[in-house]
């Protein structure tokens, strides 16, 4: 049986929860209010069906958006550098369980992109998107 989108999002949230001080959500939160370690949430970009015979492989592409503190602060920039590194970063956390608790066959964090700023709550925050491909 193929995993549901909800199961995959919850699995991604669980992996993001392993990062100290990062507040992870299974859906985009109503308000952008990064804590000390920022916030992260998955958004489903696409689904490809019939990747193998029958219903053998369904490919889900997610964007994990990470929003950290005010862009002008040095600590925020250092935190972003940490999240982009492998050892303590988003990639290591997500790829730490490539089955997302047994609901996926495997996954890969393909890239980090769109490193930029976003305005919310009269504040400019630093943000980055991670592309995650999940094979379920």
Task: Please give the residue ranges for each predicted region.
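Interfaces and regulatory segments of ATP-dependent nucleotide/adenylate/phosphodiester-chemistry enzymes
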Residues: 38
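Charged, amphipathic alpha-helical segments and their flanking helix caps
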Residues: 1-33, 43-136
């Amino acid at each position: 049986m193929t995993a549901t989108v909800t199961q995959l999002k919850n699995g991604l949230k669980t992996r993001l929860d392993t990062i100290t001080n990062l507040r992870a959500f299974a859906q985009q939160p109503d308000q952008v209010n990064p804590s000390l370690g920022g916030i992260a949430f998955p958004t489903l970009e696409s689904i490809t069906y019939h990747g193998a015979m029958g219903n053998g492989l369904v490919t889900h592409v997610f964007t994990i958006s990470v929003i950290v503190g005010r862009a002008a602060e040095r600590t925020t920039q250092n935190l972003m550098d940490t999240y982009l590194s492998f050892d303590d970063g988003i990639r290591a956390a997500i790829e730490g369980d490539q089955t997302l608790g047994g609901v996926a066959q495997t996954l890969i964090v393909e890239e980090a992109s769109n490193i930029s700023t976003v305005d919310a709550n009269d504040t400019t925050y630093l943000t980055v998107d991670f592309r995650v491909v999940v094979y379920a």
